[in-house]
Amino acid sequence: MKRADLSHPRVFNDPEWAEGYYKRNAKDIERVGKRFVKLLRNSGFESGRILDTGCGFGAVAIELAKEFPDIEIAGIDLGEPLLQLGQSLAGKAGVADRIAFSKGDVHELDFESNSFDVVVNTFMVHIVDAPVSMLNEMERVAKNQGRIMITDLRRMWLGLIVRKLRTAFTLEEGMEIIRKSDLRQGKYSKGPFWWDYMVGT
């Protein structure tokens, strides 16, 4: 199946569109957050600094903050309406004091090298202009013994029914992007609609 063009902008600057995106996708992304929590717990993680690259409305960051009280999270995104929504949702969840949302480009992270214990990325590889550049930046800011957690949609036959799956990469295409990047050795896996690449979990 040929990869389709995105049906939405790469950067969500329209407040109404951002609100609609949240309503359509909140539950799915919250489930990713819960899955990341489980993986981190199983790997022995308890505290530290986490960076959510392309955090959107903050669903993953909020799930992590709720489950790990001794962490600090930085969430970056270029979409200001999504960041504002994330701040509001974090406040309602009682974790706004531990998540710092800010506008930032995943291709040029404004953080020092070797500065985060965990770097996460959710459904962004197929959206950004230069995924290899984004992954290289994630590797740069992750600590030498840090964890890197990536999940993205997977193009497969269900894309005939679910259009957003047609815009994603296949598992093989995703792994080729990983191989072209500076990311350290990790583990590949796939779920019904997604693929994962995990380092240190």
Residue map of PLM features:
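Class I SAM-dependent methyltransferase SAM/SAH-binding core
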Residues: L51, F57-E108
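A conserved beta-strand element that flanks and buttresses the S-adenosyl-L-methionine
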Residues: V120
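Short catalytic micro-motifs in class I SAM-dependent methyltransferases
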Residues: F123-M124
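Conserved class I S-adenosyl-L-methionine
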Residues: M1-G44
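A short glycine-rich, Lys/Arg-flanked "PGG" loop and its adjoining helix->strand segment in the class I
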Residues: V132-N144
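C-terminal alpha-helical "lid/dimerization" subdomain adjacent to the S-adenosyl-L-methionine
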Residues: A4, M149-G200
